[in-house]
Amino acid sequence: MASNLLSRLLPSASDDLLEQEASNNQNRRTSSSTDERPDMDIDEENFGARFEAQDLNDLLAEASSSHMTTESRAASPEARRNAPPGINTAARAPAWRQPAPARAVPLDDDDDVPQSLLLEGGLDPPPNPHPRPDGLPPPVPGPSTRHTRAQWETTRQQQRLHGDDRGGAPVRDWGAIGRGGQFTADPKEKASWLWVNQTDLDTYMREVYEYYVGSGIYSMILRRTLSLLQSAFVVGFMTFLGWCIDYSKLSGSNKLSQVLVPKCTKEIHGFWIFALWVFTIYWLYSFYGLLTDIPRLRAMHDFYHYLLDVPDRDIQTIQWQQIVSRIMALRDLNLTTASNLSPETRKLLDSKSRQRLDAVDIASRLMRRDNYLIALFNKEILDVTVPIPFLGNRFIFSETTGWHVNLAVMEFVFSGPNGQFNQDFLKERNRRELVRRLRGRFFWTGIISIICAPFAVVFVLASYLFKYFTEYHKDPGQLSNRDFTTFAQWKFREFNELPHLFNRRRNMAYPYANLYLAQFPKDKTEQISSFVAFIAGAFASVLVAFTLLDSELFLTFEISPGKTAIFWIGVLTTIYRVARGSSPQEDQVTDPSYYLDHVIYHTRYKPDSWQDRLHTDEVRAEFAKLYQPKILIFAEEILSMVVTPFLLMFRLPQCSERIVDFFREFSIVVDGLGVTCSYSMFPFKKGTQNVNNAPANRSGAHKDDGDLREDYFMAKDNKMLASYYGFLDTYATTGKGNSARLPGRAGFHPPPQFPNAFGAMSQTAQPVDVGARGTSRGPAGRQPLQRRTPRSGPAGRDEPIASVLLDPHHQPSSASILRGSPRTGPSGRYRTPLQPVADTPGTRIEEESTIGDSWRTSRLAQDDDEEEEAPGANRGGVLQLLQQFSKAQAEGRGAGVGV
């Protein structure tokens, strides 16, 4: 009845445009008043009504003069059923019934209400001319909070109200809503609801990335299940081999039943029984965690399948950059990341700032912890050296050591709510207390390492033996295979570089690292190896020849007591293969600098001490410490299980003060992102000229106090710039569907040039940029040693391209030019590599860098470069003719070359 009275008093929908504008202004003022007063509620029936100020004032005056103290329609059961979720309609009066501040009229205490205005619960309300359509979800009862009100405001802005469906199309049936507001019918609606209400973006983005790396729900469940079964098999098989076999009876027995120990479980030592109980509890806990993670994985599967449109069958082939672009397209559907929320609605959210979620922000969230570890290694704050007799100090940082450091340091730093950064580290007054607590954590982590070391050593040894024994027995040459150590990989990693991208870059460096170490000739060793291979091959060839003549007789012929010919054939063949592998190859060209240049290009690691010394044996020795045989890496892993307690209890506590100071001085608070490492914020708008002129990149000049301070905050080995250019190379795209270098989509390019008499990489023969990295990154693993030949050498452009994966504040500015970039391509033998090229007056000299090609994503940019080269192109000569011929082929012209 109250709504009918207002409908007669207020203007109708057929008023003129001026009255509609005034009504809209009044509605905005009413909405703002509702937001500013959290104790008010909303009468849903009057959502679509329009009010004039004088009408409301007259109505309030009439109500006060008649001594009316009616209750809101929200108090009725029908209104409570029609209220939106999260809105408490029983405790407060509607917003339109609140007295105006300028004309507040005190209400009388008389409770007499006219009979016509009474709304009894048992009486039927008057029929609504516009009945509520069927199929709408029933309200979910719950307390009214700021978060639920913000959700309702967002939903009201993005979806039409119930009253707007009059005479329209039938409303879609949302399906039943289960207890707690969870959708039970439509998985797409459930995935949308979960994304809209997601507030912990760090955890959610981590789950999204783990799902992508894990290749989908079924692959992740299968991998974890097989891992549990493998660990159970290893422990059970070790128990059987250790306690259920009588090894003293092996020599005189020919059946397994004769050597088995009956009721062997009673013979197991108490210490091993304790270990079995601990392992059983851990295994059951892991299995329970797998079962409880299935609903979460199912929800992530729906998110990929319905919102990102990426089914599990495509998740192994789609690029991460496409996943990022599709997540960015969903930002306006989330409360915390939406850009279309009003300031009044934003005030009701827990986070007053809009959460940032572009490519840089997603990488910063995923790498929030790893960025700090990369910076700790870059600044050389963690002292993980162990003095070894006759060998000096050696770096010992294996996966076991990294796990304990993460437990002692990173779990302490990120001990805030929901695993966030602990704000105590940002305050200098907490320094002494934090140092004391960090030393205590190092000590107790060392105690835990001592307790777990015996079990870990036995388990890892058995697992490694069961996994690799067959491979090493079949091919002994695999014992010499090398890999980068864990310490080296942390030195190579870049800021905001996701693990799967780093693994791809590391894999590209493997073939060149092997060829580099094989470049250093050892003349004496090679001569001896050739002689041994000759002798072993001679004996083996004679034995094989006699075997072919009379195999039945000669195979049982004993050359030495108890050793037949077949035994000696196997021994001599093994000796020959090992000696032959150490002999030099006839077609090998010795040029260590060439191969190490390619290793540096992919690893992006080049200390200052290596400058102009890539051919020396000292550099080879330093590189060999980073690239060691796998068998030595495994031995170091076993040794670290014994050495790690020493590091945790004696070495690392001495670094506690520097660690605490590091987290305070290299942490910044970013609005919409939280606390993050300062190195993860790239200089998109500041440019790189000032960074290149920083003290860390200057030499030979006297450094004052200001320069020393800048040097302290500067990353070593140009790590910051390398990370910046690497990130742009990974995520740079124009949004046209093609990335910087998508394989199979580029135009025709001529074949690579042949090496000339000056060497394969001389100044006239352009370098072959192997495994050049584009946005698509190509297939994982080791890349072929070829790419298209540039027309005039790759050249960096002055203006960077814009990327659809970056927000406007992250777009590279014109100041962020590529000259001076540390990411230059492998240079020639007679050319100084990796040197920035300065501009000369009247001439633009571009550095020889493969990053330049990755920034050229349009054919127009390449044509502009060709036009710039045209005026000074006529230099004559055979090389010029070949260049013109290659250019004609690249442009697709079938005509001849003009001479």
From Swiss-Prot:
Residues 246-270, 549-552 are lumenal. Residues 124-142 have a biased composition (Pro residues). Signal peptide: none annotated. Residues 23-33, 90-104 have a biased composition (Low complexity). It is a multi-pass membrane protein. Keywords: Autophagy, Cytoplasmic vesicle, Endoplasmic reticulum, Golgi apparatus, Lipid transport, Membrane, Phosphoprotein, Transmembrane, Transmembrane helix, Transport. GO terms for cellular component: autophagosome; cytoplasmic vesicle membrane; endoplasmic reticulum membrane; Golgi membrane; phagophore assembly site; phagophore assembly site membrane. GO terms for biological process: lipid transport; mitophagy; piecemeal microautophagy of the nucleus; protein localization to phagophore assembly site; reticulophagy. Residues 442-462, 630-650 dip into the membrane without crossing it. Residues 1-224, 292-441, 463-527, 574-629, 651-899 are cytoplasmic. Residues 1-173, 769-876 are annotated as: Disordered. The chain crosses the membrane at residues 225-245, 271-291, 528-548, 553-573. It catalyses: a 1,2-diacyl-sn-glycero-3-phosphocholine(in) = a 1,2-diacyl-sn-glycero-3-phosphocholine(out); a 1,2-diacyl-sn-glycero-3-phospho-L-serine(in) = a 1,2-diacyl-sn-glycero-3-phospho-L-serine(out); a 1,2-diacyl-sn-glycero-3-phosphoethanolamine(in) = a 1,2-diacyl-sn-glycero-3-phosphoethanolamine(out); a 1,2-diacyl-sn-glycero-3-phospho-(1D-myo-inositol-3-phosphate)(in) = a 1,2-diacyl-sn-glycero-3-phospho-(1D-myo-inositol-3-phosphate)(out). Residues 63-73, 151-160, 851-860 have a biased composition (Polar residues). Forms a homotrimer with a solvated central pore, which is connected laterally to the cytosol through the cavity within each protomer. Acts as a lipid scramblase that uses its central pore to function: the central pore opens laterally to accommodate lipid headgroups, thereby enabling lipid flipping and redistribution of lipids added to the outer leaflet of ATG9-containing vesicles, thereby enabling growth into autophagosomes. This is Autophagy-related protein 9. It comes from Phaeosphaeria nodorum (strain SN15 / ATCC MYA-4574 / FGSC 10173). The lineage of its organism: Eukaryota, Fungi, Dikarya, Ascomycota, Pezizomycotina.
